[in-house]
């Protein structure tokens, strides 16, 4: 029998970040295609986007790790959320395994590793989309926030356990190590997950050693809609950065490079490095956080989008949005953003993380004019995402027949 129902599982029932946005957007796409969608989330509120005749929402109204007023409760439920596991099992029993696929979009902010027990018990075919690196890395990023560098230590190895890489406090690292150990043990993830979707080749390379040898891997890039009309970027002179102003995002490096190269710089975002950026380049403009619509307006001023992130990323949204609108991108070859950048065609790639190299890349991008975006548009279109989703679901159901 063909796919009829999808049970989508995630931490949030509202769009509060990229992971939740993809889960909710995919629910809408599936519902519009006639699939009956059950949307299961730990935390509310429930987005109005889930108001659809083919979508049924189950929200547990639980606190997330970040907004739980009881730190003790946050710590314990973050390690093992009994209520979420029991509720998910109850919901799974409502569905016919011959016509239903469960699609999980994460657990790290509220659901906890406990849901791994339900995901791996064989009751329903399960697809797990990796939106970060928590299936392997305790801090979810393969990044040492203290040394400000990509981490190549084996997760939960002796060198991992004895390194304080957490952005906040060593106690957070200890807790996250415990959670990772629980996920691998009683949570049975990731080794017992049979179908895993990855959103970039960069992510897959980092994660592959920690997944089961016989896992079924599925390429499933996130859908990205074009944010507006094409931009005549060659008429602009401002280099634009969009995102959190924190060390791993490389904003301060960009500020120094833009000043060295003598180019105007616009920072769209905020964060702990804002003051350091102002001191490094007083003439640069920092907007603070703005709406998605205002981000698109800022891109209309861009000669290029600069994406100086210092870590792998997974499938960063803003570089794709910029390219879709005709704005070239400058980034490092180590980030997932590099997968959509063709050096010298629609952007500039570099191999080293220093001010001089980035400044040189800013100069080089001035030689880039108009470029074709049609291939990228097809690759990340919502229509292609839906087609790929349905194909994966059908393949999974076929294996169970």
Which residue stretches match the model-derived regions?
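A conserved mid-protein helix/loop that constitutes part of the nucleotide-sugar donor-binding site
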Residues: 21, 240-260, 272-275
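Membrane-proximal helix-turn-helix segments that form the acceptor-binding/catalytic region
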Residues: 121, 134, 150-196
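A charged, aromatic-enriched C-terminal amphipathic alpha-helix characteristic of glycosyltransferases
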Residues: 369-400
């Amino acid at each position: 029998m063909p796919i009829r129902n999808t049970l989508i599982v995630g931490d949030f029932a509202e769009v509060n970040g990229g992971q939740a946005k993809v889960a909710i957007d995919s629910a809408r796409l599936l519902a519009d295609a006639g699939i009956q969608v059950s949307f299961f989330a730990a935390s509310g509120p429930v987005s109005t986007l889930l108001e659809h005749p083919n979508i049924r929402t189950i929200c547990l109204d639980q606190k997330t790790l970040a907004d739980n007023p009881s730190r003790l409760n946050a710590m314990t439920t973050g390690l093992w959320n009994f209520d979420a596991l029991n509720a998910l099992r109850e919901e799974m029993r409502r569905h016919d395994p011959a016509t239903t696929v469960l699609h999980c979009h994460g657990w790290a902010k509220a659901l906890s590793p406990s849901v791994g027990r339900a995901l791996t018990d064989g009751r329903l075919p399960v697809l797990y989309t990796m939106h970060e690196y928590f299936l392997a890395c305790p801090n979810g990023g393969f990044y040492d926030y203290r040394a400000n560098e990509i981490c190549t230590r084996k997760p939960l190895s002796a060198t991992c356990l004895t390194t304080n890489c957490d952005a906040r406090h060593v106690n957070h690292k200890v807790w996250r190590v415990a959670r990772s150990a629980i996920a691998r043990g009683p949570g049975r993830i990731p080794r017992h997950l049979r179908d895993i979707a990855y959103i970039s080749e960069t992510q897959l390379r980092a994660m592959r050693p920690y997944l089961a040898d016989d896992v079924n891997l599925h390429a499933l890039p996130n859908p990205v809609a074009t944010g507006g009309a094409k931009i005549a970027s060659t008429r602009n002179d401002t280099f634009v950065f969009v995102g959190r102003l924190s060390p791993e995002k490389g904003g301060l490096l960009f500020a120094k490079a833009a000043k060295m190269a003598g180019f105007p710089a616009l920072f769209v975002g905020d964060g702990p490095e804002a003051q350091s950026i102002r001191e490094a380049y007083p003439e640069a403009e920092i907007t603070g956080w703005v709406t998605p619509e205002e981000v698109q307006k800022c891109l209309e001023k861009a000669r290029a989008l600069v994406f100086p992130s210092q870590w792998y990323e997974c499938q960063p949204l803003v570089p794709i949005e910029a390219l879709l609108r005709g704005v070239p991108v400058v980034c490092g070859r180590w980030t997932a953003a590099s997968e959509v950048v063709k050096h010298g065609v629609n952007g500039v790639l570099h191999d080293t993380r220093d001010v001089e190299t980035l400044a040189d890349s800013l100069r080089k991008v001035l030689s880039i004019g108009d470029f074709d975006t049609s291939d990228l548009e097809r690759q990340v279109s919502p229509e292609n995402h839906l087609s790929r989703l349905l194909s994966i679901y059908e393949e999974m159901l076929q294996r169970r027949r």
